[in-house]
Every structure is written in C-alpha cells, then in structure tokens.
Amino acid sequence: MATEFQTFNEDLSLTSQTECEDSARAILAKLRPEWTSSEIKFEYFSVGITNKIFSAGFGTEHVIFRVFGHNTSKVIDRENEVTAWRQLAKHGFAAPLYGKFNNGLICGFLEGKSLKIEQMRDSRFHMNIAKRIAQLHASVPTNGKTLVFEKMQEFLKQLDPKFEDATKQEFFVTNFPQNLAAEIEKVEKLVIKSKEPVAFCHNDLLVHNIVFNGETKRIEFIDYEYAFPNYALYDIANHFCEYAGVEGTPDYTKCLTKDEKWLFINDYLHFKDSKNHCDVRMKAMYKHLPLFEATAHLFWAIWALVQAQNSTIDFDYLTYAHARYEQYEKRFQKYIGSVNHH
C-alpha cells in the first residue's frame, strides 16, 4: 500500500459522471496500479452542501474521492485542509490522505454510516459524541492560537454588499446589519474575555460529518474542511446548533434542552480530563455556552452569505444565512442577559 502523498494533474468533472470516472481511473492507474481499471466500481454519496463525494472500489479495498464544488476556495482554505487532515490522520482521527488532484482529494475509507438527525438526538449517542470530541481536543497539539475571527473577516472580504438580483439585495439589506465587521469585533472581545481554552477543533460537527460504526460501536468524524485550532467550547457549541438539521430551513426547536447540554458538557469534561473535572469548570463552560453558540451562528451566517453569491449548488443559502443570523442575535442577547443578571 502506497502511503506517500501524491499530486495528480487531473480535474474531475462535477457535471459529467462519465468524464469524472474516466479522470478517476487515470488517477487510480498511478495510485493503485494493481487495480484492474474495467473492474473498478463507483458509488456516490454526496451529502455535503459543497462537494461531490464518491468511492472507487476494487475487490475489498475502497478509496474516497472528494471533488470540491465551484468557488468553494472562497470559503475553504484548501492548504489548511490538507495540513489539518494529515495531522489528524497521524493522531488517528481521520482516514489516511493519499493525494490531491486539481479540484479535490483522495483519502481512505472509514467504515460506518453518517448519523441521521434522529440518531444524533438519541441520548445514547450523546455520550459517544462527547467522548470523541474530548479525545480530539486532548490529542492533537496546537499553538494555542485560534483563527476563527480571522476566518470570519476573510469571509467578509469575499462578500459583495451588492447582490446582482434585486430581490436578494432587498432581502440582504432588510435582514442583515450594514456593518457585519462590527458584529464580529463585538463577539470577539467577549470571547477573548471568557479565557476559554483553545484546542484542535473540527468546527463543523453536523450530522453528516459524524460517522457511526455499528460493529465497533465507535463514533468517528469526517470532513476536515474547517478544522483548525479554536476554542474547545466553540466546537461543542457549534455541534449543539446543528441539531436543528441542515436540509431546508433549520428548526431550532429541535436543539438539545438545557439539561441535555449540561449532561453533554459533563461527559465531555469527564472524558477529557477526569482528574480536573469539577463543578466550577462545568458552570463556567455552561455560562459561556450561549456566547459560543452565537459565535458559531455568526460564522455560518457570513459563510452562507458568501455562498449565496458564489455557489452553483441548488440550495437557498440566503434564507439559511438569515436563519443563522437570527439565532446569532438570540443567543448573543441570552448571553448578555445572563451576564448582566449576575
């Protein structure tokens, strides 16, 4: 098995399946020369809202191709993705990465199935998810600096305040503040003040990125496009926001209750550092949680605004951005209210 990372000068088509598979075979002829080209079987899984994902299999071995969507480099730092992925693979948190082509990556296959939203809401999974997040945060080293606010500012630079479509422009002007940069700065000041610890984070733990292996009963995470050092509590808060689902308009009434969130944080701390697990730490994390939920909502709201102008995928990013922005305001006000109350 070749393990050295390889680069291939091929573009995989997002529109033509035949052309896409021809290019994939050309790559596999070099990556897996022992495979018989005519016997390679392809299976498509695309569930992400930015990529095309499929597997190529020969005999019992499979590799995964991830083809990047058009214009996704505006919201995803591809160099960072490869660096983060290789670091995670080294520590046992990601499938091996075999190589890259002009518009995507080839990696190993993780056994298991992505969770469904009903499963993610099942309390039996909460502990396993909390445990895996804790293991990730405890295992992968970082320099202790987070990039989350820098990333938001980078997204903002990609956003044109003028939408080409008049209806979209009106919606944007009506539902979003003129100065989004000021919102980022406002949140950043409070987050820095919280002094929450930084860890290596996944930053995108929605249902499709959580894989459960029924045989080993283990939870694994996939898709490291947004993985970078961040506040550990951001990773948890962002995960909590995703119980609302991603298909169509998110339903935030489906998010975990206060008690469920408390239990999740309790499990997380128990698995991360049982010796220093105490009520004081629990209460501090719980107090700061709405602020970090607000931060995650703001991140994805701005991300979705950029996608609304650039993505070729049939998804209503503008309505999604609005749903996230409304939640940002709600969670932020909740945090401010609770701080002023004490």
Language model region names:
Residues 81-83, 237-240, 319:
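Glycine-rich, phosphate-binding/catalytic loops in enzymes
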Residues 180-184:
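Short proline/glycine- and basic residue-enriched helix-capping loop/turn segments at helix->loop/beta transitions
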Residues 233-276, 294-312:
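Active-site activation/catalytic loop segments of kinase-like enzymes and analogous catalytic loops
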Residues 46-65, 185-240, 245-247:
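Active-site acidic catalytic loop and adjacent metal/ATP-binding pocket
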Residues 169, 277-342:
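Helical subdomain adjoining the active site within ATP-dependent kinase catalytic cores
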Residues 1-43:
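Juxta-kinase regulatory segment immediately upstream of eukaryotic protein kinase catalytic domains
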Residues 43-179, 190-197, 215-216:
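ATP-binding pocket architecture of kinase catalytic cores
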Residues 32-35, 133, 137-144, 163, ...:
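A general structural signal marking secondary-structure boundaries and capping sites
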